[in-house]
Amino acid sequence: MFLEEKLNLVWNKILEEVSKKISPQYYERFIDTLKLETINSEKCTIIAPSATIKTHVERKYQSIIENAILETCGDKIPVEILIETKAASPLQSILEKSFDQKDFQFNPDYTFETFIVGDCNRLAYTAAKECVRKPAEINPLYIFGSVGVGKTHLLHAIGSELTKKDPWKTVCYVDISSFMNEFRFALQSRELIESFKIKYQSYNCLIVDDIQLLSTNAEKTQDEFFALFNFLFERKRQIVIASDRPSSELAIHERLKSRFVTGVQADIQYPDREIRKGIVTHHSKIMDLGLSEDILDFLADQIEEDTRLLLGALNDIYLYKKSYSLLFLNLDKVKEIVKNRLYRKKNIEFSHDRIIEAVAKEFNLNTAEIMGKSRKKELIIPRHICFYLLHNVFNVNKSQVGRLFQTQHTTVIHGVRKTEELLSNNKEMRFLVERISSKYKLQ
């Protein structure tokens, strides 16, 4: 056992070696807070002031400390890090508990191998694979698309593959609502804010979902996320962001938007027929449903909006077969089982026609003119109003609107924006849109 009076001398020599391997900023934040408790030929015990510091040092610097001990003492001595026994505040304990949890557990079913690739999602899939192959080469990766198109699947695939590739690297998956709530909680004290910063700055990869929920009202949260983004970006840490809309449509400060466009923006469209058929075929095999080709075709043809609706239909079929101990089902029975999932689709198609007819009538046009390709001014405004009504009022996805009018997704975005500008300045047009909205939202 080393004598008590020699502990400080030995510790200072160890710290001197450690300081050669770590930047001054991190040395001051993490290493300088540690204390040497005991050291002998069997074990070196070090005290950390908090669970946050302990976890971070164990993840990032323990091997550096052990090598410094070898350099100083000539022996390879294992290091044990303990937490100082002073009473922690209840708030600090809560935050440290969240930091001390195991890394996020990614869904094992959401892998690159199980992701059905087609023209609607190929760019996002390729970019996601590249994030794993060469982290931070594409940075950030911004994936956007409507609900149920596969964004979450790709996020989990990226996280799980990065973890498999290098188990020592830490990956954080967080939805922006959780990030905002955690940050608001941390604002209660300087100590909590410091722990919050340490937590998020420690990750090698940050995956953020639902970024569209970050609004301009959350000034401090935006500032914190902006600082975190820059911190990770400058250190070439991979950042992946998912949203239901392009970054240009986010209600956030321009400086954040400008960061998001520095990498790749990958749009995932609603799955085409080929992709839908691939999804139902793949999952029906996994679930051992034994569905015939005509049933698979029916499901792929009838459920277009959302892959989750497809999977929900398969779950309905599975439960029905299990409940009645059936080996096979015919097409008529499947139609009966999933009829409630098809009802929504029929209603949406019905609304399309009614809304377009209503707009055409207001402008003394016919629907064929509005649905056509003509660029005449007297047709563009009504067409844009249709875009606006279908998307903003009746919640039809922009990709669906684009398919309905046989135009590009970006054209729909432009049309919706132009209509929003028009309505803010033109009282007559605003009344027209409100009249159509109120009439058909009640039906």
UniProtKB/Swiss-Prot annotation:
Segments of this protein annotated with the region Domain IV, binds dsDNA: 322-443
- Provide the coiled-coil residue spans: none
Q: Which domain of life is it from?
A: Bacteria
Listed binding positions for ATP are 148, 150-152
Localization? Cytoplasm
Q: How does it assemble?
A: Oligomerizes as a right-handed, spiral filament on DNA at oriC.
Entry comment, domain topic: Domain I is involved in oligomerization and binding regulators, domain II is flexibile and of varying length in different bacteria, domain III forms the AAA+ region, while domain IV binds dsDNA.
- The protein depicted here goes by the name Chromosomal replication initiator protein DnaA
Per the UniProt entry, what species is this protein from, by scientific name? Leptospira interrogans serogroup Icterohaemorrhagiae serovar Lai (strain 56601)
